[in-house]
Amino acid sequence: MTPELMIKACSFYTGHLVKTHFCTWRDIARTNENVVLAEKMNRAVTCYNFRLQKSVFHHWHSYMEDQKEKLKNILLRIQQIIYCHKLTIILTKWRNTARHKSKKKEDELILKHELQLKKWKNRLILKRAAAEESNFPERSSSEVFLVDETLKCDISLLPERAILQIFFYLSLKDVIICGQVNHAWMLMTQLNSLWNAIDFSSVKNVIPDKYIVSTLQRWRLNVLRLNFRGCLLRPKTFRSVSHCRNLQELNVSDCPTFTDESMRHISEGCPGVLCLNLSNTTITNRTMRLLPRHFHNLQNLSLAYCRRFTDKGLQYLNLGNGCHKLIYLDLSGCTQISVQGFRYIANSCTGIMHLTINDMPTLTDNCVKALVEKCSRITSLVFTGAPHISDCTFRALSACKLRKIRFEGNKRVTDASFKFIDKNYPNLSHIYMADCKGITDSSLRSLSPLKQLTVLNLANCVRIGDMGLKQFLDGPASMRIRELNLSNCVRLSDASVMKLSERCPNLNYLSLRNCEHLTAQGIGYIVNIFSLVSIDLSGTDISNEGLNVLSRHKKLKELSVSECYRITDDGIQAFCKSSLILEHLDVSYCSQLSDMIIKALAIYCINLTSLSIAGCPKITDSAMEMLSAKCHYLHILDISGCVLLTDQILEDLQIGCKQLRILKMQYCTNISKKAAQRMSSKVQQQEYNTNDPPRWFGYDREGNPVTELDNITSSKGALELTVKKSTYSSEDQAA
């Protein structure tokens, strides 16, 4: 073999080997790409499947979560339904039990009422039988048992303090009667402390002068307070007062026989007098000269309606030691006093704190300016019946620290006066601005910052509306307000009452008389004033529904719904059932009411002290018999216009209502004059006549409704009566 062939063979072999290995390498690379691609495809398929599974699982998971939430809500709802069902069962049982107990209690009250009424009638029968037996025949065994079962109580065994407290509740006439029972009772009525204060005005028509003189002579060292108001006494009797050396208070108002000479004797013998009431007497300048000479410690002086003294008499007050300790002064009705007279008062009585000047049309701004120049301590001011007082008076009073102010029936007082009040009298607690037509909502806005205000009387201020009251209640004054009189403020509506329930937590007395826009919704807001004890809704549109809502209050003691023609017996009965503590009720001029309301009062409201059913012609003797049998604490009763009542009710009242003090029975055509005269000796004040009821009552002397033609003039008369009755608030009347 040649080298060339070897080289050629080697080259061929090498080429073949390279070709073989290259093809093999190429095939291997292709195989690797397919494997990688297959792996990638597998991974892609796996990833795709995972993402698909993840998406499906997410939807499934969301679905399952929703199902779980729905199931949870369903279970909660089922639990709530079961709980509400249990509550419903419990409340149903409680309601049935409460109704059963209420029904049982009501039945017990009715049964007790019937038993007491039966006992009352038996007592009346025995009493009348005893009155008819003039020879006092032997009693039956039952009557003897009734008498003998009475428990004996000897009050003379009580401590002296307790005995005094018992006798303090009695009038002078009752004390004298008690002293005539026996020797032990006479000794109890001779306690010295019992004769510190003697009120002869309550027995002015009973006790003659000689007994008054002997009483004063016997107790001359113990007497501290004497009241002769309205007594028609001889001058000698007044002179006996001078023996009471320790006398501190003397009231001789309305005594026509009291003269300057009587005053001279008293002033010489009683130098320690602190309070002196000379109102409506015939005193002159001579008495005025005696006051500073003898009464050096005089603090309270009333010269109301004494028109015989002059400015010169007021000048005498500065003589000697003067009346510089005078704190209270009443000059009501003294129209003879001029501006100079008020200057004399300012010079003599610089310490005056309480000033009352009523019924004085001659009072002007200059009079007040002259007075307050030196009397800067005035805190209480009363000007009623002074039409010439204007805003200038408030400007002049800016130097005084007023706490109580009262104006009434003044047309010259405007909103400007209240701007002075806001700036100068931050401590005002009582504001009476009744029947001041110039007052608007702006005035209430000025009063809102008064933090000490407790009493606000804006009766007959017809220009006041919801907006003004809202602005007032939004201020700090609403938090302490205790009494609010908005009678005849006809622009007020339910919005004002809603604001009252939100902002007045301490409101006790509220008058919304003749607020005609008040509805049942407003009555619902009144229930939310939890501190309320007295409400006047007379002349409003209240119905039985409103009374049912009002009965939920539970704490009302006084309710007035006079001239409310939509209420019936059912409404009053529903209210009485829930108002067991009711003390005052006025349903006068609600002619649709009958005996049923009196029965409800006798059953549920036995603590009643004041009742007015004037203008209710359907009330009969049987109703008053029930009232007398149950309501033994009745003090004030107005049955004027109850034309069906007879003399029988007066006998019942004398037996059952022994605490009756004021009785009004005008237009009672079936009550005789003789019976009324007998009754007058049992009460302190009585009004009686047998005239036919006025036409605006709406019925005749037999209780039959009058025709529309006869009732044309009724609205005017009723309005005048309503305006007159609604002027004063409860606290003002008490004062």
Curated annotation (Swiss-Prot):
CDD domains: F-box_FBXL13 (cd22124). Keywords: Cell projection, Cilium, Cytoplasm, Cytoskeleton, Flagellum, Leucine-rich repeat, Repeat, Ubl conjugation pathway. Residues 682-692 have a biased composition (Polar residues). Residues 682-703 are annotated as: Disordered. InterPro entries: F-box-like_dom_sf, F-box_dom, Leu-rich_rpt, Leu-rich_rpt_Cys-con_subtyp, LRR_dom_sf. Residues 152-198 form the F-box domain. GO terms for cellular component: centrosome; cytosol; motile cilium; SCF ubiquitin ligase complex. Its main location: cytoplasm. Component of the nexin-dynein regulatory complex (N-DRC). Directly interacts with SKP1 and CUL1. Interacts with TCTE1/DRC5. PANTHER family: PARTNER OF PAIRED, ISOFORM B-RELATED. Belongs to the DRC6 family. This is F-box and leucine-rich repeat protein 13. It comes from Homo sapiens (Human).
